[in-house]
Amino acid sequence: MRIIITIITFVLTIAVAPAQSHGIYKMPPFERAVCCIKFFEGLHQAKDYPYIGYGHRIQPGEHFRLPLTRKQADALLRRDLHKLCKMFRSYGKDSLLLATLAYNVGYGTLMGNANHPKSRLIQKIESGDRNIHDDYIRFCRYKGKVVPSIRKRRKVELLLLFHT
């Protein structure tokens, strides 16, 4: 119950008052993204394998001494997010927003792969359409079902990182 109240307070605080009055908006955008990911992912435990730290999925050939410290988890998150930002560099001001989303849903889900076409979100951004709110929020499903906490996460990400 405590975590639900904390999440609701966080979301309401961001959504209600003007952006300039909040300390989080004074942070560089990359730091906002890191804070947002940490808040919603939490620090993963052994039971969350193959996810460690703040949502890093262990890849073939990667080996880590577990459990990770918060400092190690933070460094791993930053490394992963920087890597994704580079992958989305051609999207300019949207690169951090897309990297943050890809951190959670996967690069292939957005950009397409053998199993999925390029997402509608990416298609709209590539065409210059800035009306992406609904398409971004649509990435709130797990196993085909809408998850309210993921939906809230997407709204917070947009509030913190989207530039019209």
Which residues does each PLM region occupy?
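Surface-exposed patches in mature extracellular/periplasmic domains of secreted proteins
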Residues: 45-49, 87-97, 135
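Short N-proximal segments of mature Sec-exported proteins
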Residues: 95-109
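Long, amphipathic alpha-helical surface segments
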Residues: 18-44, 56-62, 68-87, 107-164
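Early exported N-terminus immediately downstream of N-terminal targeting peptides
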Residues: 49-52, 56
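Hydrophobic h-region of N-terminal signal peptides that target proteins for export
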Residues: 5, 9-18
